[in-house]
Amino acid sequence: MKIPANILLAAVALCLCGCVDCGAFRDLDYADRAELPRLDALALDSDGSAIYGQVLVPSSKFERPRPCAIICHGFAGFTRWDDVAHDLCRAGIVVVTPHHRGAWGSEGDYTVSGCIRDAENLAAWAMSQETSSKYGIDPQAVYLVGHSMGGNSVVNAAARDVRIRGVALIAPCDIGYMAERMTKKNLTAFLVGEGLHVLHRKSDEAVVDDILANACAMRFVNAAKSVGGRKVFLATGDYDSVVPSEPLDALWRLLPYDPKRHVRMRYRADHSLMGVRRALAHALAGFILEK
Protein backbone atom coordinates (compact mmCIF):
# COMPACT_ATOMS: atom_id res chain seq x y z
CA MET A 1 0.00 0.00 0.00
CA LYS A 2 1.33 3.42 -0.95
CA ILE A 3 1.40 6.09 1.77
CA PRO A 4 -0.08 9.37 0.48
CA ALA A 5 1.81 12.54 1.31
CA ASN A 6 -1.08 14.09 3.27
CA ILE A 7 -1.35 11.08 5.58
CA LEU A 8 2.42 11.04 5.99
CA LEU A 9 2.46 14.71 6.98
CA ALA A 10 -0.29 14.08 9.52
CA ALA A 11 1.79 11.28 11.02
CA VAL A 12 4.77 13.60 11.32
CA ALA A 13 2.52 16.16 13.03
CA LEU A 14 1.56 13.52 15.60
CA CYS A 15 5.24 12.93 16.27
CA LEU A 16 5.79 16.63 16.75
CA CYS A 17 3.08 16.59 19.40
CA GLY A 18 5.23 14.39 21.59
CA CYS A 19 4.90 10.76 20.55
CA VAL A 20 8.48 10.33 19.45
CA ASP A 21 8.26 6.71 18.30
CA CYS A 22 5.02 6.77 16.34
CA GLY A 23 3.72 7.73 12.93
CA ALA A 24 6.16 8.28 10.12
CA PHE A 25 9.20 7.47 12.27
CA ARG A 26 8.34 3.89 13.07
CA ASP A 27 9.84 0.98 11.17
CA LEU A 28 7.29 -0.43 8.75
CA ASP A 29 6.28 -4.06 8.27
CA TYR A 30 7.56 -5.31 4.93
CA ALA A 31 5.56 -8.19 3.45
CA ASP A 32 7.61 -8.20 0.26
CA ARG A 33 11.33 -7.78 -0.35
CA ALA A 34 10.51 -5.24 -3.06
CA GLU A 35 9.07 -2.93 -0.39
CA LEU A 36 12.31 -2.68 1.59
CA PRO A 37 14.17 0.60 1.88
CA ARG A 38 17.73 0.43 0.65
CA LEU A 39 21.13 2.05 0.87
CA ASP A 40 23.06 2.84 -2.31
CA ALA A 41 26.67 3.93 -2.61
CA LEU A 42 27.34 7.46 -3.86
CA ALA A 43 30.33 8.19 -6.08
CA LEU A 44 29.84 11.52 -7.83
CA ASP A 45 32.30 13.52 -9.89
CA SER A 46 32.44 17.03 -8.45
CA ASP A 47 34.66 19.27 -10.57
CA GLY A 48 37.03 16.40 -11.26
CA SER A 49 37.11 14.91 -7.75
CA ALA A 50 35.08 11.85 -6.81
CA ILE A 51 33.04 12.47 -3.68
CA TYR A 52 31.70 9.46 -1.85
CA GLY A 53 28.77 8.86 0.43
CA GLN A 54 25.41 7.12 0.70
CA VAL A 55 21.91 7.43 -0.72
CA LEU A 56 19.13 6.31 1.63
CA VAL A 57 16.10 5.25 -0.40
CA PRO A 58 12.72 4.97 1.36
CA SER A 59 10.45 1.96 1.16
CA SER A 60 8.46 1.62 -2.06
CA LYS A 61 5.39 1.96 0.16
CA PHE A 62 5.93 5.71 -0.05
CA GLU A 63 4.43 7.43 -3.06
CA ARG A 64 6.62 8.80 -5.82
CA PRO A 65 7.82 11.43 -6.43
CA ARG A 66 9.49 12.06 -3.08
CA PRO A 67 11.42 15.00 -1.67
CA CYS A 68 15.18 14.72 -1.37
CA ALA A 69 17.42 16.02 1.41
CA ILE A 70 21.17 16.35 0.84
CA ILE A 71 22.94 16.58 4.21
CA CYS A 72 26.30 18.36 4.10
CA HIS A 73 28.62 17.75 7.04
CA GLY A 74 30.51 20.37 8.96
CA PHE A 75 34.21 21.00 9.54
CA ALA A 76 36.00 18.67 9.66
CA GLY A 77 33.17 16.14 9.55
CA PHE A 78 33.46 14.43 12.94
CA THR A 79 29.83 15.18 13.84
CA ARG A 80 27.71 12.55 12.11
CA TRP A 81 24.07 12.92 11.06
CA ASP A 82 23.23 9.29 10.30
CA ASP A 83 20.51 9.20 12.96
CA VAL A 84 18.69 12.17 11.47
CA ALA A 85 19.24 10.82 7.95
CA HIS A 86 17.59 7.51 8.81
CA ASP A 87 14.67 9.26 10.51
CA LEU A 88 14.10 11.36 7.40
CA CYS A 89 14.26 8.24 5.24
CA ARG A 90 11.68 6.53 7.48
CA ALA A 91 9.43 9.52 6.76
CA GLY A 92 9.62 8.89 3.02
CA ILE A 93 12.42 11.29 2.10
CA VAL A 94 15.34 10.32 -0.14
CA VAL A 95 18.46 11.27 1.81
CA VAL A 96 21.96 11.82 0.42
CA THR A 97 24.89 11.94 2.86
CA PRO A 98 28.08 12.92 1.00
CA HIS A 99 31.64 13.41 2.18
CA HIS A 100 33.08 16.61 0.72
CA ARG A 101 36.17 16.68 -1.48
CA GLY A 102 39.26 16.06 0.61
CA ALA A 103 37.21 14.71 3.53
CA TRP A 104 36.82 11.15 4.80
CA GLY A 105 38.06 9.34 1.72
CA SER A 106 36.62 11.57 -0.99
CA GLU A 107 39.11 12.68 -3.63
CA GLY A 108 40.56 16.14 -4.08
CA ASP A 109 41.80 18.90 -1.81
CA TYR A 110 39.52 20.33 0.84
CA THR A 111 38.53 23.99 0.61
CA VAL A 112 35.47 25.78 1.93
CA SER A 113 34.66 27.16 -1.52
CA GLY A 114 35.01 23.62 -2.85
CA CYS A 115 32.36 22.45 -0.38
CA ILE A 116 29.96 25.01 -1.82
CA ARG A 117 30.63 23.67 -5.29
CA ASP A 118 30.08 20.12 -4.02
CA ALA A 119 26.66 21.14 -2.68
CA GLU A 120 25.79 22.75 -6.01
CA ASN A 121 26.88 19.66 -7.94
CA LEU A 122 25.00 17.31 -5.61
CA ALA A 123 21.79 19.31 -6.01
CA ALA A 124 22.14 19.34 -9.80
CA TRP A 125 22.75 15.58 -9.75
CA ALA A 126 19.66 14.96 -7.58
CA MET A 127 17.51 17.09 -9.89
CA SER A 128 18.76 15.41 -13.06
CA GLN A 129 16.33 13.25 -15.01
CA GLU A 130 18.47 10.14 -14.54
CA THR A 131 18.77 10.45 -10.76
CA SER A 132 15.23 11.65 -10.10
CA SER A 133 13.85 8.75 -12.13
CA LYS A 134 16.09 6.19 -10.42
CA TYR A 135 15.20 7.22 -6.87
CA GLY A 136 11.73 8.67 -7.39
CA ILE A 137 12.88 12.18 -6.47
CA ASP A 138 10.70 15.20 -7.11
CA PRO A 139 13.20 17.53 -8.82
CA GLN A 140 11.18 20.49 -7.55
CA ALA A 141 11.56 19.32 -3.94
CA VAL A 142 15.32 19.06 -3.45
CA TYR A 143 16.55 20.48 -0.14
CA LEU A 144 20.06 21.21 1.06
CA VAL A 145 20.68 20.53 4.76
CA GLY A 146 23.91 21.64 6.40
CA HIS A 147 25.40 21.51 9.87
CA SER A 148 28.03 24.02 11.00
CA MET A 149 30.35 24.65 8.03
CA GLY A 150 27.85 22.62 6.04
CA GLY A 151 25.40 25.44 6.66
CA ASN A 152 27.81 27.75 4.88
CA SER A 153 27.99 25.26 2.01
CA VAL A 154 24.26 24.91 1.52
CA VAL A 155 23.13 28.52 1.94
CA ASN A 156 25.68 29.70 -0.60
CA ALA A 157 24.92 26.86 -3.01
CA ALA A 158 21.20 27.61 -2.79
CA ALA A 159 21.86 31.29 -3.45
CA ARG A 160 23.50 30.27 -6.73
CA ASP A 161 20.85 27.77 -7.86
CA VAL A 162 17.25 28.97 -7.63
CA ARG A 163 15.95 25.49 -8.48
CA ILE A 164 16.78 24.30 -4.96
CA ARG A 165 13.48 24.23 -3.03
CA GLY A 166 14.86 25.16 0.36
CA VAL A 167 17.69 25.04 2.87
CA ALA A 168 17.95 23.76 6.41
CA LEU A 169 20.70 25.35 8.48
CA ILE A 170 21.62 23.46 11.64
CA ALA A 171 23.90 25.40 13.99
CA PRO A 172 25.36 26.96 10.83
CA CYS A 173 28.78 28.58 10.71
CA ASP A 174 28.95 31.92 8.91
CA ILE A 175 32.67 31.52 8.33
CA GLY A 176 32.79 34.71 6.26
CA TYR A 177 31.51 36.72 9.22
CA MET A 178 34.01 35.04 11.52
CA ALA A 179 36.95 35.47 9.14
CA GLU A 180 36.32 39.19 8.84
CA ARG A 181 36.67 39.48 12.62
CA MET A 182 39.73 37.28 13.16
CA THR A 183 43.39 37.58 12.35
CA LYS A 184 44.79 35.02 9.95
CA LYS A 185 46.67 33.46 12.86
CA ASN A 186 43.52 33.13 14.96
CA LEU A 187 41.49 31.77 12.06
CA THR A 188 44.16 29.15 11.44
CA ALA A 189 44.17 28.21 15.13
CA PHE A 190 40.36 27.90 15.09
CA LEU A 191 40.44 25.55 12.11
CA VAL A 192 43.29 23.49 13.56
CA GLY A 193 41.32 23.15 16.77
CA GLU A 194 38.30 21.90 14.83
CA GLY A 195 40.28 19.14 13.04
CA LEU A 196 41.98 20.66 10.01
CA HIS A 197 44.71 18.01 10.26
CA VAL A 198 42.37 15.16 9.24
CA LEU A 199 41.46 16.73 5.89
CA HIS A 200 43.35 16.14 2.65
CA ARG A 201 44.52 19.61 1.63
CA LYS A 202 47.32 21.34 -0.21
CA SER A 203 48.31 23.05 3.04
CA ASP A 204 46.76 24.64 6.12
CA GLU A 205 47.47 28.03 4.59
CA ALA A 206 45.65 27.11 1.37
CA VAL A 207 42.46 26.38 3.31
CA VAL A 208 42.76 29.62 5.29
CA ASP A 209 43.57 31.72 2.22
CA ASP A 210 40.54 30.29 0.41
CA ILE A 211 38.31 31.42 3.27
CA LEU A 212 39.83 34.88 3.42
CA ALA A 213 39.53 35.35 -0.35
CA ASN A 214 35.82 34.47 -0.29
CA ALA A 215 34.82 35.77 3.15
CA CYS A 216 32.70 38.70 2.00
CA ALA A 217 30.94 36.76 -0.75
CA MET A 218 30.10 33.89 1.64
CA ARG A 219 28.44 36.06 4.30
CA PHE A 220 24.98 34.73 5.09
CA VAL A 221 23.38 38.16 4.80
CA ASN A 222 24.45 38.23 1.15
CA ALA A 223 22.43 35.07 0.50
CA ALA A 224 19.29 36.35 2.22
CA LYS A 225 17.75 38.00 -0.82
CA SER A 226 18.12 34.89 -2.97
CA VAL A 227 16.99 32.28 -0.43
CA GLY A 228 14.37 34.48 1.23
CA GLY A 229 11.75 33.63 -1.37
CA ARG A 230 12.20 29.92 -0.73
CA LYS A 231 11.87 27.66 2.30
CA VAL A 232 14.38 28.21 5.11
CA PHE A 233 14.79 26.18 8.32
CA LEU A 234 17.17 27.49 10.99
CA ALA A 235 17.94 25.41 14.09
CA THR A 236 20.36 26.48 16.80
CA GLY A 237 21.49 25.34 20.24
CA ASP A 238 21.26 27.69 23.19
CA TYR A 239 24.55 26.34 24.55
CA ASP A 240 26.49 26.54 21.28
CA SER A 241 29.99 27.85 22.01
CA VAL A 242 31.46 27.17 18.55
CA VAL A 243 29.68 29.57 16.19
CA PRO A 244 28.43 33.10 16.90
CA SER A 245 24.70 33.80 16.85
CA GLU A 246 24.90 37.39 15.58
CA PRO A 247 25.13 36.56 11.84
CA LEU A 248 22.33 34.02 12.18
CA ASP A 249 20.05 36.58 13.81
CA ALA A 250 21.00 39.06 11.08
CA LEU A 251 20.07 36.55 8.37
CA TRP A 252 16.76 35.81 10.04
CA ARG A 253 15.85 39.48 10.28
CA LEU A 254 16.40 39.86 6.53
CA LEU A 255 14.00 37.05 5.64
CA PRO A 256 10.39 38.10 4.98
CA TYR A 257 7.91 37.07 7.65
CA ASP A 258 6.47 33.79 6.40
CA PRO A 259 5.93 31.23 9.20
CA LYS A 260 4.86 28.53 6.75
CA ARG A 261 8.07 28.66 4.73
CA HIS A 262 10.53 30.06 7.26
CA VAL A 263 10.93 27.95 10.40
CA ARG A 264 13.10 28.94 13.38
CA MET A 265 13.88 26.30 16.01
CA ARG A 266 15.88 26.79 19.21
CA TYR A 267 16.97 23.87 21.35
CA ARG A 268 18.59 23.52 24.75
CA ALA A 269 21.64 21.89 23.21
CA ASP A 270 25.22 22.56 22.19
CA HIS A 271 26.72 22.83 18.71
CA SER A 272 26.22 19.13 17.95
CA LEU A 273 22.51 19.22 18.85
CA MET A 274 23.08 15.99 20.78
CA GLY A 275 20.19 15.20 23.09
CA VAL A 276 17.57 16.78 20.82
CA ARG A 277 18.21 14.91 17.58
CA ARG A 278 14.83 13.14 17.55
CA ALA A 279 12.92 16.38 18.02
CA LEU A 280 15.11 18.03 15.41
CA ALA A 281 14.48 15.21 12.92
CA HIS A 282 10.73 15.49 13.43
CA ALA A 283 10.76 19.24 12.89
CA LEU A 284 12.99 18.90 9.84
CA ALA A 285 10.80 16.20 8.30
CA GLY A 286 7.73 18.36 8.82
CA PHE A 287 9.49 21.28 7.15
CA ILE A 288 10.52 19.19 4.13
CA LEU A 289 7.16 17.43 3.72
CA GLU A 290 5.12 20.62 4.02
CA LYS A 291 4.11 21.68 0.51
Annotate the PLM regions.
Residues 22-62:
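N-terminal cap/lid segment of alpha/beta-hydrolase-fold proteins
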Residues 66, 72-77:
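Active-site glycine-rich loops that stabilize anionic/oxyanionic intermediates
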Residues 75-87, 246:
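The serine-hydrolase catalytic nucleophile loop
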Residues 89-107:
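Conserved alpha/beta-hydrolase
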Residues 110-136:
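Alpha/beta-hydrolase active-site loop
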Residues 134-148:
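Alpha/beta-hydrolase fold nucleophile elbow
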Residues 156-207:
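Hydrolase active-site cap/lid region
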Residues 207-282:
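Serine-hydrolase catalytic core
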